[in-house]
Amino acid sequence: GTGGDGMNTLNISTASALLLSSMGVKVAKHGNKAVSSKCGSGDVLEALNIKIDLEPNDIETQINKNNFGFMFAPNYHSAMKFVGPTRKKIGKRTIFNLIGPLSSPALVKRQIVGVFDKKLLKIFANALKNLGIKYAWIVNSEDGLDEISPYAKTHIIQLKENKISEISIDPKKLNVNADKFENLIGDDAKFNADKIINIFKGEDNDFSKAVCLNAAAGLIVNENHINFADAYNNAREHILSSKAIKHLEKVQNGWKCSWKNNSKEKFKDKKFKK
């Protein structure tokens, strides 16, 4: 998503991406470290002991093996390395917040994009259409999140087979029963990572519900489900079963095996001087 909603929430989209991967959906997440918030996707993944700067072939291996790969934006868009410090100093959203979701190196055909302003919904839908995206949801909630909210209605523009339509998700109709927005406020990378670990172990709270709502969107766009309520209930059942924590451990350990094997392949024909 664009980020820049100013809410400083927990890493909902990153957690939902990991949850989706534990449910068998292949996810190529494109992200960065924090710019206008305390903790970006790159920060929380590092705090979860997931390596974020793998080579493209290693990322592909991880997606094929564990259904999850993270593409660290500065590694793929070299100019961003020079822009990054200035963005951090500004501390507010800029045009680069809008560019990020449109520049995935994975060239995906299915995508969930959260935007910080409802006015951007159709703009992004048309941009993704021009980029050849097959199926996408662009989301913005009435309480200001660039995510599907567990507290308020979320407005969605759906792009499917070049057709654009409007839909909405109302958590009240889904009996989400989330408590209060303050329960989604995040902090530093360790704090946010611990929250992800807790819900993956089966802890039931507002964060878990928010993650399941956004994972449900992924199940719809991946065409695992056609009914959002069924997708949400499936995600809830899965996360409460603690299956996600076992998968997280595989993702944490997967890059080590990938790097080790790749290193052997790179150096097996080379001779080193003593």
Please place each PLM-identified region on the residue numbering:
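Glycine-rich anion-binding loops and their surrounding alpha/beta cores
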Residues: 5, 9, 24, 46-53, ...
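Active-site-proximal loop->helix
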Residues: 33-51
